[in-house]
A protein has these predicted regions:
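N-terminal organellar transit peptides
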Residues: 1-208
Length: 208
């Protein structure tokens, strides 16, 4: 009987390659701590448009704090953010006041850091020195003021549990509200501190 050399060991089959780990949505963080003016809103809208066309994120996550500003600029920014084809997350990083509350409502998800606040109040306007108002001009001004308050009340009522009657009461009070109120009334969904992942893209728009 011939002595046959032992057969070489059969190499193990290549183990299956695991599928790549699922990646979360591409999120870009935008830090905005500033007032709301026509010029600043134009810059912010331009930045958002450029991010969408060049980086194509799935989520824009705003760390947002503002003491308000121009009503028309704020409503324009709200409508612009609502129109974007991606998710908007708003996170109150300090204080959301006046028309900034409307912009905050553009978030499909809304959070607030501990110790942050919200301030709801009515609209005020400043007149230039020696401005003269006749009856018709005064009526026109008052009508525009009422329409702006109606728009603000409608947006907030449509995105929270607050009724328009409650919102108009807040306009008269001009009162700062805590996070318990914000949670109860659906202004926010959660109280949590912001946490930006390591390596995330963050843009600060704290403009001069």
């Amino acid at each position: 009987m011939d002595n046959q050399p032992p057969l070489p060991p059969v190499p193990p089959a290549n183990p299956p390659v695991p599928p790549p780990a699922p990646t979360g949505p591409k999120t870009i963080y935008i830090n905005y701590f500033d007032v709301i003016t026509d010029a600043k809103v134009k810059v912010l809208m331009a930045v958002c448009s450029e991010l969408l066309s060049q980086q194509k994120p799935d989520v824009l996550y705003f760390l947002f704090s503002s003491n308000g500003g121009n009503v028309n600029a704020g409503i324009t920014l709200y409508n612009f953010l609502k129109a974007l084809p991606l998710e908007i997350v708003m996170h109150n990083a300090g204080s959301i006041d006046s028309i900034a509350t409307v912009i905050f409502m553009a978030g499909t998800k809304r959070y607030a850091s501990k110790h942050s606040t919200f301030l709801f109040h009515g609209i005020a306007s400043q007149f230039e020195s020696k401005t003269t108002l006749d009856r018709n001009k005064f009526k026109e001004f008052l009508s525009a003021l009422e329409q702006d308050e109606n728009k603000i009340a409608g947006i907030i009522a449509g995105t929270t549990k607050l009724s328009q009657e409650e919102i108009r009461g807040l306009f008269l009070q001009g009162e700062s509200k805590d996070l318990t109120f914000a949670m109860d009334k659906g202004v926010i969904q959660e109280i949590k501190d912001a946490a930006i992942p390591k390596g995330a893209t963050i843009i600060s728009l704290n403009l001069n």
